[in-house]
Amino acid sequence: MERKNSSRESPRRLSAKVGKGTEMKKVARQLGMAAAESDKDSGFSDGSSECLSSAEQMESEDMLSALGWSREDRPRQNSKTAKNAFPTLSPMVVMKNVLVKQGSSSSQLQSWTVQPSFEVISAQPQLLFLHPPVPSPVSPCHTGEKKSDSRNYLPILNSYTKIAPHPGKRGLSVGPEEKGTSGVQKKICTERLGPSLSSNEPTKAGAVPSSPSTPAPPSAKLAEDSALQGVPSLVAGGSPQTLQPVSSSHVAKAPSLTFASPASPVCASDSTLHGLESNSPLSPLSANYSSPLWAAEHLCRSPDIFSEQRQSKHRRFQNTLVVLHKSGLLEITLKTKELIRQNQATQVELDQLKEQTQLFIEATKSRAPQAWAKLQASLTPGSSNTGSDLEAFSDHPDI
């Protein structure tokens, strides 16, 4: 019916429609040029839209409408960019004599294909406005910081303190500046310990003084190492500057401190601990030297020449002793050892008391003189009171 009505129209109306068609073609050309310029500015060019003719575009629109696909299924950014490019024009879609009307701004969230409103156009459309596709901007990905290499992270090694590091490994972490300062400290310690060592040595009347090129004795060398280790003053109330070697007479005045030969530092440490545990009264002079630090220093000042391996073991033992003393573990260990010794002695006394109680029960049950004699023999190493009680028991077996 629409085609019959269109054929019966007057030629004036047809000429007016032709004029309108030419005007629409001009407007379409202007819009195409503006869209091309906007595509060039945005860096995107749609080659397919330039090559296809209007008839091919209409066919493609027919196929898309048959499949139920709409232009508004594209991302919303395309419509926003199209509105920004043509703020005065409103976008529309024409599909074969059908104009899809847009809804209000509140219905932008809904798709046009759900409930569209159509308007039938009587004439063949000459204007087709398509939304230019714009690629979505790539959001910069925020890369996090690179994690540290798990192979270099060793939590077990970093959790515990090094009590006695090996001397060879200690020299690797020392910088050149620290080496220079340690050399100066060694020189100062040698100058301070030199006169004190020479004053204690017996000198003869006709003895020739030693030349400056004579190497220092090993005891002085070990004293330098102990000074570098940060060993505090060993004499009560003294300072590191007034530190002097201990002579053999001082050791003789301390009977509770017994030392083994310098060749066995482990035995010497055990004897030192046993000497500290003993409760025998010490002289005031020996009380000053009863600390484990003094014992380690005395071992380091021994006149015997150590080999390199023994010296390294000695230094490690001294480092361990100093660290244990500063952390308080040494005192805890000594107290624990003393408590263990007292516990063992108490356990022995309890065993003896159990045995004597068993003998007393047997003697009271049997009332035999042999049982009382056996009980008396078991109580003989006891006190005099127990002996008198035992005699009373033997005199009165009926008790």
Swiss-Prot record:
The keyword Hydrolase is assigned to this record: no
GO cellular component: cytosol; nucleus
Record PTM Phosphoserine, positions in chain: S213
Keywords, comma-separated and alphabetical: Biological rhythms, Coiled coil, Cytoplasm, Nucleus, Phosphoprotein, Repressor, Transcription, Transcription regulation
Transmembrane segments: none
Single GO biological process annotation from the record: rhythmic process
Ranges in a coiled coil: 333-359
Biased composition, class Basic and acidic residues, residue ranges: 1-12
Main location (coarse class): nucleus
Record localization: Nucleus; Cytoplasm, Cytosol
Region (Disordered) residue spans: 1-85, 159-224, 378-399
The UniProt record lists the keyword Coiled coil: yes
InterPro entries per UniProt: CIPC
Biased composition, class Polar residues, residue ranges: 378-388
PANTHER family, per the entry: CLOCK-INTERACTING PACEMAKER
Subunit structure: Interacts with CLOCK. Forms a ternary complex with the CLOCK-BMAL1 heterodimer. Interacts with CAD and HSPA5.
Described purpose of this protein according to its UniProt entry: Transcriptional repressor which may act as a negative-feedback regulator of CLOCK-BMAL1 transcriptional activity in the circadian-clock mechanism. May stimulate BMAL1-dependent phosphorylation of CLOCK. However, the physiological relevance of these observations is unsure, since experiments in knockout mice showed that CIPC is not critially required for basic circadian clock.
Identification of the protein by name: CLOCK-interacting pacemaker
The organism of origin for this protein: Pongo abelii
Upper classification of the organism: Eukaryota, Metazoa, Chordata, Craniata, Vertebrata
Gene that this sequence comes from: CIPC
